[in-house]
């Protein structure tokens, strides 16, 4: 097997990125991301794209500053499925943490679904510690286009940023 090194950069996610991010979710999910871009314009959230040299997103995710006071809450984190377990998720989380620190905040939090042990293991490797559990739910689009309510249990995790 040959190893390939790809240079990555993190930047603000822009509306034009939606067309190349079908890998991250359904049309309903992408419509939600579009809504978050307006919140980013207002300074309520940061929404990031991790790109290779082509400037096409291979990962994306947000930091919400309105969930808890003095905390940046990471959410909607996703890495292109073909590129998972290559370090891109780590790059995304670290870029999000930098955004949090640039706002003068020192705590990052996130929720990870309990049926996603690989993601939880990543967050633990990055220094996140579980502190609670909480049910969560959202609408998702089925393959036939219909909407259904998705319900899950999440482990809440946090990290003190240096």
Predicted features and spans:
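Active-site acidic-Proline motif in GNAT/NAT acetyltransferases
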Residues: 80-86, 114-115
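C-terminal "cap" of GNAT-fold acetyltransferases
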Residues: 106, 113-117, 126-129, 135-162
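Acetyl-CoA-dependent GNAT
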Residues: 3-82, 93-95, 99, 156-162
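Conserved short alpha-helix immediately C-terminal to the canonical SAM/SAH-binding motif I
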Residues: 92, 116-119
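Conserved phosphate-binding and hydrolysis motifs of nucleotide-dependent enzymes
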Residues: 59, 87-89, 127
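Conserved acyl-CoA
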Residues: 91-107, 129
């Amino acid at each position: 097997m040959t190893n390939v090194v790809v240079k990555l950069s993190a930047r603000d996610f822009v509306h034009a990125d939606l067309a190349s991010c079908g890998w991250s979710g359904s049309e309903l999910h992408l419509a939600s991301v579009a809504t978050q871009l307006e919140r980013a314009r207002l300074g309520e959230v940061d929404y990031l794209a991790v790109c290779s040299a082509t400037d096409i997103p291979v990962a994306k995710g947000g930091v919400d500053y309105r969930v808890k006071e003095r905390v940046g809450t990471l959410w909607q984190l996703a890495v292109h499925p073909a590129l998972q377990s290559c370090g891109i998720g780590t790059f995304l989380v670290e870029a999000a943490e930098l955004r949090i620190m640039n706002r003068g905040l020192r705590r990052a939090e996130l929720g990870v679904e309990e049926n996603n042990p690989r993601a939880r293991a990543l967050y633990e490797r990055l220094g996140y510690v579980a502190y609670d559990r909480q049910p969560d739910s959202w609408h998702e689009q089925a393959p036939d286009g219909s909407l259904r309510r998705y319900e899950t249990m999440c482990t809440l995790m946090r990290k003190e940023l240096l």
